[in-house]
Design a protein with these regions (language model features):
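Small/flexible residues
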Residues: 61, 81, 323-325
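Intrinsically disordered, low-complexity repeat regions of secreted/extracellular protein precursors
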Residues: 67-121
Length: 433
């Protein structure tokens, strides 16, 4: 059998084992996860690099001077007005000249301080970016290198041991079951009226402030997390596993974990996390769009066992009319998910997020479920303004978490099926006489 056929056949076994491990085991408490190791590596590497790439001295002075440029200009205007008054009084000519000389010297010093502050800022930015780039390289080399070594050792002992080990690794890197369980941990308290319990549960899976959220806001946060992480947590790593096996999976998870830990636009990581954030955008560019298209396709099958909500606000009429009409509460509704609305909202809103990738699956989910997602959100006590996606024909309810999870599962299974079908075709073509 040709080498390509053998590799494709082994990859099929790896994917099947990964699916079994993910669905059967998930991420139980107390069981070590590879991402924990990657996270510890990132933290220690960051600490070492921050000591190596020291922030230039004068950072406090930099902020003081830059923030007070306007005060210096105001002082200049006040001094100019005082000069005009002094020149009218000949008795104070000498004093005015001395004062002007002192002021000119002070202006020169202020200008020099501002220039030094700007130079310090540029130097600090360069050091931070360089340190962040080095961190990305070190983490990727260490994580993928260790996995390569371990898998090679397993294959050397026995080829099937290598396949099983790689399949278990891939299964641990997927988050289908764990994300479903985390989402249901939010849904169940909401259905029972336990808003505080749901708030505690949702705080475990989102980065936003959860204290301001009411029941609808909690359900909305859970739906957004499931929709976004359909790609980040399941289909994107699966995409790279189909192409490159366990090495592709660990490489992607390392990039994604770095973005999650240091890819923030705050004072600490604005420059240090630039390399990680941009690499994550590149790695997710194709998987996020593929996930969105697959999610649109699975909307062709109606939900079963989930009651359809009443949509009472507006629906889009035919293209020829191109306008909206009001609906009465007793108007018959199309069953969810709505494939046409999913495609329409995806085309319209997929670029509304600051990230080039995160709104891809979120916009599909918003359209399919007739919801309005994103919008203003609180992070660390500060309100962040975000564009809204979707038409919001109805309020978000706890059962929408179930619907979002169903879309995630369907999308993931479809990608599994496509990947295995492609690999089977590759085996057949490689063995063609």
């Amino acid at each position: 059998m040709p080498v390509i056929a053998i590799a494709a056949r082994n990859r099929i076994w790896i994917l099947l084992i990964a699916a079994i491990v993910d669905l059967a085991v998930g991420d139980p408490p107390g069981l070590w996860h590879p991402v924990q190791g990657i996270g510890a590596l990132i933290s220690r590497t960051e600490s070492g690099l921050r000591r190596l790439f020291k922030i230039p001295v004068g950072k406090e002075k930099l902020h003081h001077n830059i923030n007070n440029i306007s005060n210096i200009n105001n002082a200049d205007n006040a001094r100019s007005a005082q000069d005009n008054q002094d020149t009218q009084d000949t008795q104070h000519t000498q004093n005015t000249q001395n004062t002007q000389s002192t002021q000119n010297a002070q202006d020169t010093q202020d200008t020099q301080d501002i220039q030094n502050a700007q130079d310090t800022q540029n130097a600090r930015e360069s050091r931070e970016r360089a340190a962040g780039g080095v961190l990305v390289l070190l983490v990727l080399i260490a994580s993928t290198g260790l996995v390569l070594l371990l898998l090679a050792l397993c294959r050397r002992i026995n080829p099937w041991l290598g396949i099983i080990a790689e399949g278990i690794l891939c299964g641990r890197l997927l988050a289908l079951r764990s994300l479903r369980e985390a989402a249901y941990a939010v849904r169940d308290p909401l259905l029972q009226g336990d808003v505080d319990g749901a708030r505690r549960a949702v705080s475990m899976i989102v980065g936003r402030d959860t204290d301001p959220l009411n029941a609808e806001g909690i359900a909305k946060a859970a739906v957004e997390t499931v929709a976004e992480n359909t790609s980040d947590g399941v289909t994107a790593p699966l995409f790279y596993m189909i192409l490159f096996g366990g090495i592709g999976g660990i490489f992607y998870k390392a990039v994604n974990t770095m973005d999650s830990m240091i890819g923030y636009k705050n004072d600490r990581y604005r420059f240090f996390g630039t390399a990680a954030a941009r690499l994550d955008d590149v790695m997710n560019y194709i998987p996020s769009r593929l996930s969105a298209l697959l999610m649109i396709l699975v909307c062709a099958v109606p939900f079963k066992g989930i009651s359809n909500p009443q949509i009472q606000q507006v629906t889009l009429q035919s293209k020829s009319q191109g306008r909206l009409k009001e609906e009465s509460p007793d108007t018959p509704q199309e069953k969810l998910p709505d494939m046409r609305a999913a495609f329409r909202i995806w085309r319209r809103d997929r670029r509304k997020s600051p990230s080039p990738n995160s709104a891809q699956t979120e916009s599909v989910c918003a359209g399919a479920l007739h919801l309005r997602l994103l919008g203003d959100t609180w992070y660390f006590g500060k309100l962040h303004h975000k564009a809204e996606i979707g038409d919001g024909d109805r309020a978000v309810e706890p059962h929408d978490i179930t619907r979002a999870v169903s879309l995630m599962v369907r999308t993931s299974l479809l990608l599994y099926a496509i990947g295995i079908a492609v690999l089977l075709a590759l085996v057949e073509l490689s063995c063609w006489p």
